[in-house]
Amino acid sequence: MVLTKYKAAAVTSEPCWFDLEGGVRKTIDFINEAGQAGCKLVAFPEVWIPGYPYWMWKVTYQQSLPMLKKYRENAMAVDSDEFRRIRRAARDNQIYVSLGFAEIDHATLYLAQALIDPTGEVINHRRKIKPTHVEKLVYGDGAGDTFMSVTPTELGRLGQLNCWENMNPFLKSLNVSMGEQIHIAAWPIYPGKETLKYPDPATNVADPASDLVTPAYAIETGTWTLAPFQRLSVEGLKKNTPEGVEPETDPSTYNGHARIYRPDGSLVVRPDKDFDGLLFVDIDLNECHLTKALADFAGHYMRPDLIRLLVDTSRKELVTEVDRNGGIVQYSTRERLGLNTPLENDKEGKK
């Protein structure tokens, strides 16, 4: 049975830069805080663990190499003890967790999102389909079986997208077609519009993401939309600056960009620039009714006889295996990573 009214939270905080263990501990602390506050859902920013590598937008190739090595060393695998600890925290607090993290799989990093349910099971695991611009120097592409967003839950049909995926009209259409009701628009760290320098387009600063793209998503889909954002401190600026380069001294432009919007695009809450913590919202799924009554692009306000979207969720392998009957052995990324295996009922989980 779907709950129609419940409390949720979006994280706006500074990551533990280049620190997997610290990031896991801070994640668990926020899960505990949200659970103690009575939340049924807590949402984290894009690549919250081990932080968004914003330095890649600002440094040369040679300058990036020591930071890239350290970043990769602190990425998180889904079959790791660190990830299982986060799953246990979700189970202990009986809460849904939408987690953004830099996932390492073999030797490639991905901009990953996991949706963990109150039993600690991973009910959705996805990867950003296309890293944005210089992100391609750090991350790989998601595959056909790792990009679906919307998952049926007891909180409603919940979707997740990373950063500029939230303005991708095709992904938005796909989510609408699945009846999305709650959306996690996970964003990284971004400077504000006051830093914009010609000819860099305004698309590339935080304000349009917070105040144009995210409410537009809410309006067009008729969903409750939570936009968790990372923050930055003076110390964080130093950690994200290579040796020999003078770091910035004022982090304020990077802060205060998290938002929560109602299904009609109206603002629920925005933080002050100095706020670090959880933004809370009381969700009522019944508020989706009138927005979708006006414009349901998956139903009465669409013409599939004229416009349709083709979706391919199959995984394309570099190497395929032939079975004894001459067919191709099929398996999913989820199976290979062991995400179909239930979280063990171990002693640590009972603490």
Curated annotation (Swiss-Prot):
Write out the GO biological process terms: cyanide catabolic process
Q: What induces it?
A: By cyanide.
Q: Which family does it belong to?
A: Belongs to the carbon-nitrogen hydrolase superfamily. Nitrilase family.
pH dependence per the UniProt record: Optimum pH is 6-7. Active fom pH 5 to pH 9.
Molecular function (GO) terms for this protein are: cyanide hydratase activity; nitrilase activity
- What keywords does the record list, in alphabetical order? Hydrolase, Lyase
Q: What assembly does the database describe for this protein?
A: Oligomer of dimers, forming left-handed helical fibers with a diameter of 13 nm but with lengths ranging from approximately 1 um at the leading edge of the peak to having approximately the same length and diameter at the trailing edge.
The broad enzyme category this protein falls into is: lyase
Q: List the disulfide bonds.
A: none
Domain CN hydrolase span(s) in chain numbering? 6-285
Gene3D superfamilies from the entry?
A: Carbon-nitrogen hydrolase
Q: What does this protein do?
A: Catalyzes the hydration of cyanide to formamide. Degradation of cyanide may be important for plant pathogenic fungi in infection of cyanogenic plants.
Pfam families assigned = CN_hydrolase (PF00795)
Q: Which gene encodes it?
A: cnh-1
EC number per UniProt: 4.2.1.66
Q: Which reaction does it catalyse?
A: formamide = hydrogen cyanide + H2O
Name of the featured protein: Cyanide hydratase
